[in-house]
Amino acid sequence: MRKNYDNIQIIRGDITTAKVDCIVNAANSWLIPGGGVDHAIHQAAGPELAIAVKKFRHCDPGNAVITPGFNLKATSVIHAVGPIWNKSENTEEHEQVLSKTYQSIYELATKHAIQSIAIPNISTGVYDFPKDLAAEIVWQTTLAFLNTSQSKMKIFFYCFDAENYNLYTRFLQKLKS
């Protein structure tokens, strides 16, 4: 039986304005405000977000934690830590960690009964993960989640740049054809 993937959308835009239950933050292991989407989410949520993540102290790559959304339209934020790509290291391990990152997102979202979620491109910015490989891993992990769960969660992939947007759009078009 073919699954209906109409609950997945690809959006090129500002994730901080997403009207969803939860926004995913591409966080660093120390959970302190950093650059890129992490900076934008902390700015939009207000100083309470930085205080809320302090209680966790640390989050290993592949894992995630959840906090309230504070000044965001979203009621919660999942802070997910992706791998830092280094092609001189074990790249297969990096791939497994990126997959685990998205698994952690979906597990937390399910645990907290999140009905709609906005997810950025994790690790493909300053963490330098190859965008095409990351997109493939994201889709494999997302499809595994959707095909094995009863979730009706709406998933919005927010892409900041054209390359990620085009990669994600192609994957979704293939899926729906």
Model-derived regions, located:
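Glycine-/small-residue-enriched capping loops at alpha/beta junctions
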Residues: 1-112
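Phosphate/ribose-phosphate-bearing ligand recognition and processing surfaces
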Residues: 85-177
